[in-house]
Curated annotation (Swiss-Prot):
Subcellular location: Cytoplasm, Cytosol; Golgi apparatus; Mitochondrion
Keywords per UniProt: Cytoplasm, Golgi apparatus, Mitochondrion, Schizophrenia
Protein's UniProt name: D-amino acid oxidase regulator
Stretches for region Involved in targeting to the mitochondrion: 1-25
Gene for this chain: DAOA
KW Membrane (keyword) present: no
Database matches in InterPro entries: DAOA
Expression (tissue specificity): Expressed in the amygdala and in astrocytes of the cortex (at protein level). Expressed in the caudate nucleus, spinal cord and testis.
Result of changing residue 30 to K: Does not affect interaction with DDO
Assembly and oligomerization: Interacts with DAO (D-amino acid oxidase); the interaction is direct, can occur in the presence or absence of FAD or substrate bound to DAO, and results in a complex containing two DAO homodimers and two DAOA monomers. Interacts with DDO (D-aspartate oxidase); the interaction is direct. Interacts wih SOD1; the interaction is direct. Interacts with MSRB2; the interaction is direct.
Residue span of region Interaction with DAO: 138-153
Main location: cytoplasm
Length: 153
């Protein structure tokens, strides 16, 4: 997958600078460090391997062509996998991690929508609704239905 994203030449350049090991990729957190100064010499590489995260400091990182390939591949991933999500967990996150993140975004949106729908109609509180249902059923004493509420508790 990386060969497709970055091209064979750029992958060789990248591989010569950092050892990838497993494809549980190393995500480079450049933006935090270089937001103040583009000439910062330090950057942090976060490596995730089998659930454990180790943070290592790489000395002497400067903005070079490898950097451009990282950003290009991140944009490519964002466009191809989930263009509607503005943030991905890491530039080269595994597909499971990306889809998990997208799922969380969808669930959050869904939850917000449902909460909004539930809170939209506050004119008829839950208690009054129960009372109305109870009185209606009392009038129709021959029909004993279970009283259920459609509102979210």
């Amino acid at each position: 997958m990386l060969e497709k994203l970055m091209g064979a030449d750029s992958l060789q350049l990248f591989r010569s600078r950092y050892t990838l090991g497993k494809i549980y990729f190393i995500g480079f957190q450049r933006s935090i460090l270089l937001s103040k100064s583009e000439n910062s010499l330090n950057s942090i590489a976060k490596e995730t391997e089998e659930g454990r995260e180790t943070v290592t400091r790489k000395e002497g990182w400067k903005r070079r062509h490898e950097d451009g390939y990282l950003e290009m591949a991140q944009r490519h991933l964002q466009r191809s996998l989930c263009p509607w999500v503005s943030y991905l967990p890491q530039p080269y996150a595994e597909l499971e991690e990306v889809s998990s993140h997208v799922g969380k975004v969808f669930m959050a949106r869904n939850y917000e929508f449902l909460a909004y729908e539930a809170s939209k109609d506050r004119r008829q509180p839950l208690e009054r609704m129960w009372t109305c249902n109870y009185n209606q059923q009392k009038d129709q004493s021959c029909n004993h239905k279970e009283i259920t509420s459609t509102k979210a508790e």
